[in-house]
């Protein structure tokens, strides 16, 4: 029904109750069953500056729900009094998964989607992201030796959206040279790229447009379906003409990727559904 569809559209793209999250739990419990004893786990809740604010130890099935109660209070912030049309932030070259996170095009898409995941609750359905990135062509091939090949494949052979790449997952996951680099050269496992693309598609699904500003190699960004402009001002004016109208509500997040992130929520909704 259309009502059910509307509810689905309002839901955040990921949650602590998703199939992926429950599968993580099932995998751990299956390992415990085969080992014949449970894991002893220590779970620390960190604040915005990565300081420990709570520490729980014990059997994961019992301990983790208690840990998440505190983590949810720190993470989900009921704040917004209105929905926003445009989200502004910057993307450094080195963060999260390592140097090149903000310049490798597939890793860039994962980072853009992470912002959608965090702040979808306070953004309009046709929202626009404007993000600065040096986008200089640095793939960091030593860390992600498979991503240049994935990116090139995405440019050809009817690859219109990132999920079209899914059929190559096993092909990359069994590539012996990539596996050797994972085992001996500190590279990521080749299937990690498919995890990144799975997340990376969330940004396209939940935005009207994404602009990268200040790119040295803008063609790399355009190859991922992103729009490119020289400055924030140019991107905002273009977004106003094409997507948001003349008076957009703008959410500027200057500390993005510098501090431990929160998930912004509507003030009146509190932490419902997190």
Residues of each region from the PLM?
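Solvent-exposed alpha-helices and their adjacent loops that cap or buttress functional pockets
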Residues: 1, 31-35, 77-81, 121-123, ...
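Short, small-residue-biased leader/transition segments that mark boundaries at the very start
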Residues: 1-8
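Membrane-embedded hairpin module used as a gating/binding unit in multi-pass transport
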Residues: 10-98
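Short glycine/threonine-rich loop-to-helix capping motif typified by GTGT followed
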Residues: 53-58, 97-107, 139-152, 225, ...
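A short, acidic, amphipathic alpha-helical segment used as a generic capping/interface helix at domain edges
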Residues: 61-78, 111-119, 185-204, 230-242
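Structural motif
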Residues: 85-90, 130, 251-252
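C-terminal catalytic subdomain
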Residues: 106-210
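Extended hydrophobic packing segments that form well-structured cores
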Residues: 198-274
């Amino acid at each position: 029904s259309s009502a059910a569809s509307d509810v689905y559209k309002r839901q955040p793209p990921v949650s602590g109750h998703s199939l992926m999250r429950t599968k993580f739990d099932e995998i751990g419990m299956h390992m415990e069953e085969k080992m014949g004893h449970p894991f002893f786990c220590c779970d620390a809740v960190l604040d915005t500056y990565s300081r420990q604010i709570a520490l729980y130890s014990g059997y994961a099935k019992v301990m983790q729900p208690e840990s998440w109660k505190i983590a949810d209070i720190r993470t989900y912030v009921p704040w917004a009094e209105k929905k926003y049309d445009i989200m502004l932030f910057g993307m450094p070259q080195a963060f999260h998964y390592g140097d090149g996170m903000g310049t490798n095009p597939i890793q860039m898409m994962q980072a853009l989607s992470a912002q959608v995941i965090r702040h979808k609750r306070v953004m309009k359905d046709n929202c626009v992201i404007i993000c600065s990135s040096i986008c200089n062509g640095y793939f960091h091939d030593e860390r992600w030796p498979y991503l240049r090949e994935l990116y090139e494949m995405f440019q050809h052979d009817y690859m219109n959206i990132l999920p079209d790449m899914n059929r190559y997952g096993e092909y990359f996951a069994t590539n012996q040279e990539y596996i050797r680099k994972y085992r001996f050269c500190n590279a990521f496992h080749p299937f990690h790229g498919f995890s990144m693309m799975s997340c990376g598609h969330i940004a396209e699904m939940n935005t009207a447009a994404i602009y990268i500003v200040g790119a040295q190699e803008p063609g790399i960004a355009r190859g991922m379906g992103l729009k490119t402009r020289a400055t924030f001002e140019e991107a905002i004016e273009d977004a106003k003409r094409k997507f948001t109208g003349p008076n957009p509500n703008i959410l500027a997040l200057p500390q993005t990727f510098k501090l431990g992130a929160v998930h912004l929520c509507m003030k009146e909704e509190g932490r419902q559904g997190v």
